[in-house]
Amino acid sequence: MGDREQLLQRARLAEQAERYDDMASAMKAVTELNEPLSNEDRNLLSVAYKNVVGARRSSWRVISSIEQKTMADGNEKKLEKVKAYREKIEKELETVCNDVLSLLDKFLIKNCNDFQYESKVFYLKMKGDYYRYLAEVASGEKKNSVVEASEAAYKEAFEISKEQMQPTHPIRLGLALNFSVFYYEIQNAPEQACLLAKQAFDDAIAELDTLNEDSYKDSTLIMQLLRDNLTLWTSDQQDEEAGEGN
C-alpha cells in the first residue's frame, strides 16, 4: 500500500474515532503530495478541517461571551485571564485557517484546470469560508483585508457556479448559503443576504426537475437551510423596523 492510500486510510479511521486533528493532518499530507483529489478525498479534507475549525469557533464564542460578562462585572483580574485565553484560542483558529488557505492556494485551486469547474467552485467556496472564519475574530485593518479576501473568493466561485452549474447543484446551493451568511453576519448587510438566499432558493425551486437522484438529499437539505435563514432574517428585519418606528 502506497503512502497516499495509507494516509487516506488513517484519515477515514480518524473520522470514525472523531479525532479530527489527526484526520486533518493526514489530509494535509495527502494534499501536499500534489496529486488531484477525488470527490471522496475532497470531502474528507473538508470534513476534517470543518470540525477542527468548528471546535475553535465554538470555544471562541463561549469565551468571548464570558469576557463581555466579566467586563460588565468589572472584575479586572479575571478579565485579564479570560482575555489571554481568548487570544490563545484565536491563535489556534488562525493557524488552522491559514493552513487551509495555504493548501488551497499552493495546491488545490492552483491545480484546477478550466474544465474542473466543480472542484474550482468547491475550493473557492472553501477559501471564502476560511477567510470568513478569520473575519469573525479579527479587528481593525486586519479584519478589512480578510473580509475583502473572503468576498473576492465567494464572488469568483459564485460567477463560475452560475455559468456552469444547475441551480439545484448542492455545491452551488451550499455556496449561496455561505455567501449569504457572509453578507448577513460579516458585512452586516441583511438586504443583500436575503436577496442572495431568496434568488438561490427560487432558482432551485424553478428547476426541481433537474435534481440529481444522488444529490437529492443534499440539495433539499441546503434549500431548507436557505429558507430557514430567510425566515429568521426577514423576521429580524421586521422587528428592527418596528423598533425604529417607536
Swiss-Prot record:
CDD domains registered for this protein in UniProt: 14-3-3_eta (cd10025)
Gene3D superfamilies: 14-3-3 domain (1.20.190.20)
Keywords (A to Z) from UniProt: Acetylation, Phosphoprotein
Residues the record lists as Phosphoserine modifications: 25, 59
Entries under SMART domains matching the protein: 14_3_3 (SM00101)
GO cellular component: cerebellar granule cell to Purkinje cell synapse; cytoplasm; cytosol; extracellular exosome; intercalated disc; mitochondrion; plasma membrane; presynapse
Site entry (Interaction with phosphoserine on interacting protein), positions: 57, 132
GO biological process, one term: substantia nigra development
Superkingdom of the source species: Eukaryota
Positions of post-translational N-acetylglycine modification: 2
Signal peptide stretch: none
GO molecular function: actin binding; enzyme binding; identical protein binding; insulin-like growth factor receptor binding; nuclear glucocorticoid receptor binding; protein domain specific binding; protein heterodimerization activity; sodium channel regulator activity
Post-translational modification: Phosphorylated on Ser-59 by protein kinase C delta type catalytic subunit in a sphingosine-dependent fashion.
InterPro entries assigned: 14-3-3 (IPR000308), 14-3-3_CS (IPR023409), 14-3-3_dom_sf (IPR036815), 14-3-3_domain (IPR023410)
Function: Adapter protein implicated in the regulation of a large spectrum of both general and specialized signaling pathways. Binds to a large number of partners, usually by recognition of a phosphoserine or phosphothreonine motif. Binding generally results in the modulation of the activity of the binding partner. Negatively regulates the kinase activity of PDPK1.
Name of this protein: 14-3-3 protein eta
The species this protein was found in: Homo sapiens
Lineage: Eukaryota, Metazoa, Chordata, Craniata, Vertebrata
The gene coding this protein: YWHAH
